[in-house]
């Protein structure tokens, strides 16, 4: 359903067909070709007066309320309603807003109150068939059709005359009906006001009646209560006379009891004094307990803080332990590598570990000193003493002055691996420390954990 910015006035009330003849649609085709604009011609009857918000809509056949329009166009108000040209009006629907299916539709004129004032015959939107374009008939059929057309034209004129007469009668009846409806609306309004007034008056009377009934019930109840109260007072008076005698006797008894109570009061006063002194002692004890509790709480807090500090230090020590463990594994791997290299060199020179152990000097003979960092000693010192200088070329480590045989294996690789064993690398930032600065290395790793 197509709508514009300003929607037309509609009604959700099911409408009757009593007002459909006030606007008559003329020259409505049985079908319209899709894709083209269509013009709707209509005639305003004598007693119908158009208004600014009246509109013409296209409705699908079978509609119930004026809200079911497919599209609509506002009507144009005539300048002079009394002229004949003002009664003949037209409105054009653009092809873009027209339905695209082949259902049956009809034009409906709706006033600004949402009341339908006229409806056209049904029509369709479909293309032309060949039967609609070309029709071939015989001469006799043509004559018969012409005769039939003459009869239809005559009948049409008679029907038009009858229609005009009926329209006039309908217009008169519509005017009368309009007056009656206005009178009926006036009477309904008056009746509604009277009913409202009567209802309000009735409500006031009912409220007053209920109030009177409630007051009557209250008075009756109070009267009954007063009678009961009088009986009760008389009974109380008799009882009070008897009680007075009892009270006189009771006063004497009470006097004796008072003397006895005075003696007990003195004893209780002494007991109360003792209890107050005992209470003061208890309060002092409670105060001391509170102070002890405060001291215990402070001590517990200190222990908690110490526990947290120890936990933190434990986690830091665990990190350092992991770092040192990895460094230890690295050193063990390097030591294994050096052992394998040592065995390979010994095998290359025709020596074994057992024979080499006898060649290693046990003291500082020959001006050389055993490096305490090597597990199996310096294998090259024995080789230097037992081998001729012509067989091996000896080179020294620039850090620890250890000997390396350059003719046996790659001196640069061996030297690099040897230097790695003499340094400590930080596993976090890869900073290198000499092996003799182990404490500085551990402090550096510990700083990363802070």
UniProtKB/Swiss-Prot annotation:
Q: List the source organism.
A: Bos taurus (Bovine)
Quaternary structure, from the entry: Dimer. Part of a complex consisting of CALCOCO2, TAX1BP1 and MYO6. Interacts with GEMIN4. Interacts with ATG8 family members MAP1LC3A, MAP1LC3B, GABARAP, GABARAPL1 and GABARAPL2. Interacts with ATG8 family member MAP1LC3C. Interacts with LGALS8. Interacts with TOM1; the interaction is indirect and is mediated by MYO6, which acts as a bridge between TOM1 and CALCOCO2. Interacts with AZI2.
Q: Looking at the record, which segments are called Interaction with LGALS8?
A: 371-381
This protein's record includes keyword Zinc? yes
Motif span (CLIR)?
A: 133-136
GO MF, one term, reads: zinc ion binding
Q: Cite the CDD domains for this sequence.
A: Zn-C2H2_CALCOCO2
This protein's domain notes: The MYO6-binding domain is required for autophagy-mediated degradation of infecting bacteria such as Salmonella typhimurium, but not for bacteria targeting to autophagosomes.
Q: Which positions bind Zn(2+)?
A: 426, 429, 444, 448
Give a Gene Ontology cellular component term annotated to this protein: perinuclear region of cytoplasm
**Zn fingers (UBZ1-type): where?**
423-448
Q: What is this protein called?
A: Calcium-binding and coiled-coil domain-containing protein 2
Per the annotation, the residue ranges of the short sequence motif LIR-like are 203-206
Report which residue ranges the record marks as coiled coil.
135-349
Q: How does it sit in the bilayer? A: Peripheral membrane protein
Listed under GO biological process in this entry are: positive regulation of autophagosome maturation; xenophagy
Protein's job: Xenophagy-specific receptor required for autophagy-mediated intracellular bacteria degradation. Acts as an effector protein of galectin-sensed membrane damage that restricts the proliferation of infecting pathogens upon entry into the cytosol by targeting LGALS8-associated bacteria for autophagy. Initially orchestrates bacteria targeting to autophagosomes and subsequently ensures pathogen degradation by regulating pathogen-containing autophagosome maturation.
Report the Pfam families cross-referenced here: SKICH (PF17751)
Asked if the Swiss-Prot or TrEMBL record annotates the protein with the keyword Cytoplasm, the reply is yes
Region named Interaction with MYO6:
395-450
